[in-house]
């Protein structure tokens, strides 16, 4: 804080996020996070990748979109720092052409995507094709759109919603729409995709949750903004006919159809329907039991 300019930054930063907690350790942790985030980005600068501005030797020197970016930005909403969250908005909204190039060429007309890791302008290389490439990790931009949705919900800026978020979310969900199919059971299914850092499965819970959330959110947006989009019937059909989340009677949510959660992993991608998407909710007694069972099994796995 010897630099007057830097001192002014933190004088502005801390009052905006002021919070006291009865537990001193938790309060200290909170303030450390606020300091870290203020050190790592500005609204008009690069998004926060795995190392931020600190140069260090690491196997992960990029922006990783399968968990890291999303979790990093959550803290900025409720802490009253949408000014810093703008770095994520700008990274996505200002790099649409790069997001288009991340999609295999045959689908670039109406779809956007981002791969597991990218540079600071969202160039990741082409993502996989569901049902063709075993590691087709296709839900990462929809998950990033959930972070953009949370930012919008704290701003409630409908011009931003109409001109920025809606087009990106629509095209992110469009990639799924190229591959959904109706099974003999009359339900809509997804071919094999990749659950982040775990493995591949048909009807992958990670992707079913994001597809469902995306369609629900697109319908909410079109209703709010009175947008008469030609895909509205398709989104409604998906919500009505999408196959249920694959579950195990004893252990809860699975990775996907016929693929159990069998070994320990910190990524909780198969649980996105419960959190942060809230497609299943603890207020429903049956869903509460499913959430509790799934969490206990996920946390109880060792190895």
Regions found by a protein language model. Name each.
Residues 1-10:
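Single conserved hydrophobic/aromatic residue that forms the stacking wall/gate
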Residues 19-94, 108-109:
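Structured secondary-structure scaffolds
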Residues 28-39, 91-94, 98, 167-179, ...:
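Alpha-helical scaffold segments in carbohydrate-active enzymes
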Residues 37-46, 59-65, 84, 97-102, ...:
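Secretory-pathway/luminal and periplasmic proteins that interact with or process carbohydrate-rich
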Residues 44-53, 161-164, 181-190, 227-231:
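Short, glycine/acidic-rich hinge or "gate" loops at secondary-structure transitions
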Residues 51-63, 108-131, 187-206, 252-265:
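Carbohydrate-binding/catalytic loop surfaces
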Residues 65-102, 109, 122-129, 133-159, ...:
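Active-site core of glycosidic bond-cleaving carbohydrate-active enzymes
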Residues 171-224:
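Acidic/histidine-rich catalytic neighborhood
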């Amino acid at each position: 804080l010897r630099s007057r300019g830097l001192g002014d930054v933190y004088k502005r930063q801390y009052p905006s996020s002021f919070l006291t907690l009865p537990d001193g350790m938790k309060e200290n942790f909170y303030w450390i996070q606020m300091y870290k985030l203020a050190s790592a980005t500005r609204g008009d600068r690069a998004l926060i990748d795995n190392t931020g501005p600190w140069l260090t030797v690491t196997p992960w020197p990029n922006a990783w979109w399968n968990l890291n970016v999303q979790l990093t930005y959550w803290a900025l909403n409720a802490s009253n720092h949408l000014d810093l969250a703008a770095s994520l908005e700008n990274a996505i909204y200002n790099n649409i052409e790069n997001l288009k190039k991340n999609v295999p060429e045959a689908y670039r007309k109406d779809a956007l995507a981002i791969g597991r890791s990218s540079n600071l302008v969202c160039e990741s290389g082409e993502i996989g094709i569901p049902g063709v490439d075993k590691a087709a990790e296709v839900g990462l931009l929809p998950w990033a759109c959930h972070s953009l949705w949370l930012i919008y919900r704290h701003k409630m800026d409908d011009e931003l919603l109409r001109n920025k978020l809606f087009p990106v979310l629509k095209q992110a969900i469009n990639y799924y729409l190229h591959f959904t199919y109706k099974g003999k059971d009359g339900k809509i299914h997804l071919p094999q995709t990749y659950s982040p850092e775990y493995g591949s499965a048909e009807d992958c819970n990670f992707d079913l949750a994001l597809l469902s959330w995306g369609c629900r959110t697109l319908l909410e947006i079109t209703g709010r903004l009175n947008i008469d989009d030609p895909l509205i019937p398709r989104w409604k059909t998906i919500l009505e006919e999408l196959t249920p989340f694959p579950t195990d009677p004893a252990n809860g949510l699975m990775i996907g159809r016929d693929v159990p959660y069998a070994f320990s992993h910190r990524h909780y991608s198969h649980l996105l329907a419960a959190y942060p998407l809230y497609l299943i909710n603890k207020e429903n007694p049956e869903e509460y039991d499913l959430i509790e069972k799934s969490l206990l099994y996920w946390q109880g796995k060792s190895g």
